[in-house]
């Protein structure tokens, strides 16, 4: 599933660099930013099932006010303030359409056991991904401290994520109804099924993103209400799952197979993945793109795990006063970090030692990157 944060900003920052090699290869002048935006707008409109004439202004594409899932005054007030600082009308419209989109179309606020509960549909599929939901609400953290309504929405995401992790720490996606059957394409997967799980692809980042969101929420608001006994148990579950997937004591309980014509949609060798040495890194069967790993020691997700575990240690120390959890999280972070330094790099013929994308601990390395986060390029963001 796609992480759709700051996409337009990243595109614009790199657009000029993308144009140069394209122009050289094609023997043509670089297109203007305006022309590039219009082309992007046309592609966006096609994807949305609407049409935009070449040369037309970008459409104002927010749902009508009665159809918006969640409206927040602080968010609405921020939009025109930011627009006034943007000189390009097309970028103004992109921001107006994109910044509130999560609130307009994907959140379902409610309550569970008397506490805030927020279901966040990933957008194109009626299921909640741990990764996507964390990323979708991230842009609103800076507004939450002084806004109880927005704070409750975010608390609801954190609480629901904790329940999801306790339901199955190896799952990447969950259904709205915790008793529901899986997503249609996952019904016949050969793995341990649990009610309420949409899909069970083991990805390290699925357990990193909820920590990132919880830590970001705490830093932004100072609020510790979401971090109750249930959240603490979910945090311990994350640490234990990472430990098991270091595979020092065997392969662990997780395996996954799917009958598919697409090799990247299933896991080889009886669902436990290609061979790799237990060097201290955490094994992952899938990438954040939901494609299977070739080598199970997935470097970007392990780098992300080091950061997330240290964020968890900070939360355990300052938000919930659990010294043992803080110690366990920091100890694991140190161990994974050392293993990455020793095994996560490879030698490039021109640039010397660089991070690999995936390794197996035997000396084999995959040299590539993935458009999703975590990837090597996105490490600075995470």
Where are these regions (language model features)?
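N-terminal secretory signal peptides
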Residues: 1-32, 42-48
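Sec/Tat signal peptide C-region and signal peptidase I cleavage site
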Residues: 52-54
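Low-complexity, Ser/Thr/Pro/Gly-enriched N-terminal "stalk/linker" regions
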Residues: 56-131
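Well-ordered alpha-helical scaffold segments within catalytic/enzyme domains
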Residues: 74-87, 135-148, 209-224, 303-322, ...
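Active-site-adjacent bridging/hinge elements
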Residues: 103-116, 180-189, 275-287
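Short, solvent-exposed segments of well-ordered alpha helices
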Residues: 120-127, 194-201, 205, 229, ...
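Aromatic-rich carbohydrate-recognition surfaces in CAZymes
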Residues: 126-154, 158-264
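Extended ligand-binding clefts on enzyme/binding-domain cores
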Residues: 130, 166-177, 239-306, 318-319, ...
